[in-house]
Amino acid sequence: MLISIFTFVKAENDIIPYALIMTTTTILNYFISFLWIKKDVSFVKIPIKEILISSKNMFIMLLLANANMLYTLLDRLFITRSPHLEYISYYTISMNIVMLITIVLTGTINVTIPRLSYYLGKKDNDSYEYLINQSSSLFLFFIIPTGIGLILLGTFATVIYASEKYTAAGIVTSLFALRTLVWSLEYILGNQIIFVNDKERTLTLYYFIGGIINLLLNTLLYINNIFQAEYYVLTTLIAECIVVTLEILFIKKYNLVSLRSIFQKSTRYIAISLGFIPIYYTCKNIFQITSHTININALIMICCTITFSALYYASVLYIIKDSTMMYTMDILYNKLFKKFKK
């Protein structure tokens, strides 16, 4: 794939060759995977009646998998109508920066879903709730300070990622980072609780309600000739806040699981992470950073801000004996101890 890209994609307008390469690579990847799996797994005949019975649930899953089209993809469709072509670049670059970081952290949630389903199948509610609290706490432990850090360093991150040409996209990156705080909570409520409890129809309905709200807000912006990317991030944020509210009400109504621990951890990590603000401005003043130009001073300031913020965050959580902090330290200690022991 990389060889093909470097061979056939030589200019910024080579969109069709790039699309063909990516499409062909994806098809080949699926086909080779199919052949590889086919060696060990044989086809099973399924009666038409059984397929028809399952098709309803499969259709719900199809809607659920594509509901996100009514959020960030819809935003981009509206922004492309703008006479200012740079706005779509601001939106896409900022979203990519934030998603590159957050997608790594979602693994702590995804890996627990099969085990959560297993516990529910066994009616082991205690183990189910314990695993939700443990995995969600670990996820929030990392995602919240990362999000708040990106809110502060959004413009610098954008310039480092895409050059000074896209400095104006910094505010969009910061807003996407703010959206991450809401999105992370929705990710827990939607995937670990509602979906695992076989309530995918309700989850799909909520996603579409939020998507329709986003569509209406985007249409309102479009009618008023507002195309700046930051406004469209805000419409998505508002829609996702409504989805989270609906999910919380649903979980509480049917008593699926206690949300007390999740809310306590979220509040704690947000409150502590707000301490990054004075650290950032102190470092900025010490190194006399007055612009978003990336030079040695700016890089040192960014590194100092991240380092001191991380030390402050870890120290406060250690002092108050936060369970997730202690759990993380135990894992690190055991791995380092075993490494040095060898």
Q: Predicted segment positions?
A:
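Short runs within selected transmembrane alpha-helices of multi-pass transporters and secretion channels
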Residues: 1-2, 18-35, 64, 68, ...
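Interfacial/gating helices of multi-pass transporter permease domains
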Residues: 15, 53-61, 79-99, 126-131, ...
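Membrane-proximal transmembrane or re-entrant/amphipathic helices at the cytosolic face
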Residues: 254-258, 263, 281-342
